[in-house]
Design a protein with these regions (language model features):
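Beta-rich carbohydrate-recognition and catalytic domains
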Residues: 1-107, 115-215, 224-284, 295-299, ...
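C-terminal substrate/ligand-recognition segments
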Residues: 289, 293
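Catalytic core of Fe(II)/2-oxoglutarate
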Residues: 221
């Protein structure tokens, strides 16, 4: 097994549960035995929390959570935890403001990602901007949340920032499309010097040839910087006679030019199998949005939305998952090119 290192700040109190005994099929990922960690009706007026992002904050953890209100409109709620497993939520949705400090709430907001770049925390979500589009905000204290200009035109979803600048610029993955529900579904990379003006758009990877990602794909958790490249957990979607199936996939992107895919796992890493993944408001969904990881031990905790109803937690080790992705890698010419045509 190759020795792979995380090039990230240490988080010694990463949530963890050892691999269960007995044979294991497929990828070296195992579910938390007490899943789901967030159930139904977690907050007054909120029916379901899912597709949410968490990260270390001080000596504890903080998160931004997709809360599906009882009226069916999604918003983003703030949560706090001492162990990143048991969460307390603020009853009011996050109060976004504009650059002048005046209230500036999106019509709706869902599927947030949370990424720290330098000394600022960024929230990226999907919202209505004359169609499905990317919304962004920043905070330094999780008290004031200032909206940033919309980075892209509609239609676009599943955006996530890289956790550091590359070649002096912010980098963001996203999935543009020609409608809100993505007749085409490839991941693209864009860069910006200031989070306002975005360009140098590059194709990263397209839907795969395997059944689990044959319809579309989309970015998931913020990429993890490693000695092998950027480790990306993403989602792949297949279509069945009973609707979509969302699975978790893995890829490794070039460290200096993330539009180049070095390795891409042919197999899914996690697919709906447990009751909380197969049964819910939208059945058969595993949707990754965040990881917490410890560089010294290689431990990775993966947070994912389950069946649009719950939050699940899974675990892996860096060297094992990288080896699995490399051993089972199948890349296409479109994956390995620089993505400029």
């Amino acid at each position: 097994m190759s020795e792979v290192k995380m090039l990230t700040a240490p988080v010694p109190n990463v949530p963890w549960q050892d691999r269960p005994a007995g044979p294991q099929n497929g990828a070296p990922i195992w579910r938390y035995s007490e899943n789901p960690i967030i159930g139904r009706n977690p907050v007054k007026g909120v029916a379901r929390i899912f597709n949410s992002a968490v990260m270390p904050y001080g000596d504890a953890f903080i998160g931004v959570f997709r809360g599906e209100q009882t009226n069916g409109i999604p918003y983003i709620y703030l949560g706090h935890s001492k162990d990143a497993i048991h969460w307390d939520f603020e009853e009011n949705k996050i109060p976004f403001v504009d650059e002048n400090g005046d209230p500036f709430m999106p019509i709706y907001a869902y599927d947030p990602r949370l990424v720290k770049v330098e000394d600022t925390y960024y929230i990226i979500w999907c919202q209505d901007f004359y169609g499905a589009a990317i919304g962004m905000a920043k905070t330094t204290d999780f008290k004031t949340f200032t909206r940033i200009e919309n980075p892209f035109l509609p239609f676009n979803r599943n955006a996530v920032l890289f956790p550091r600048k590359i070649n002096g610029n912010f980098m963001m993955l996203s999935r543009p499309s020609d409608s809100g529900h993505t007749p085409f579904g490839d991941i693209f990379l864009s860069e910006s010097p200031d989070l306002v003006y975005w360009g140098k758009h590059r194709h990263v990877m397209g839907k795969g040839s395997e059944w689990w990602e044959s319809l579309k794909i989309g970015g998931g958790a913020a990429p993890i910087e490693t000695s092998e490249g950027w480790l990306l957990f993403y989602h792949g979607v297949s279509g069945t006679c009973n609707g979509y199936v969302y699975s978790i996939g893995g890829a490794i992107l070039d460290i200096d030019n993330p539009s180049i895919v070095k390795y891409r796992c042919e197999n899914f890493l996690l697919t709906p199998e447990e009751w909380y993944e197969e049964r819910g408001f939208v059945p058969n969904v595993c949707f990754p949005c965040a990881t917490i990881h410890y560089s010294a031990s290689g431990k990775i905790a993966i947070y994912y939305g389950a069946a649009d109803s719950y939050v699940g937690l899974a675990f892996t080790k860096l060297d094992e998952i990288v080896d699995y992705i490399k051993t089972n890698s199948v890349v296409t010419p479109a994956d390995t090119e620089i993505g400029r045509r």
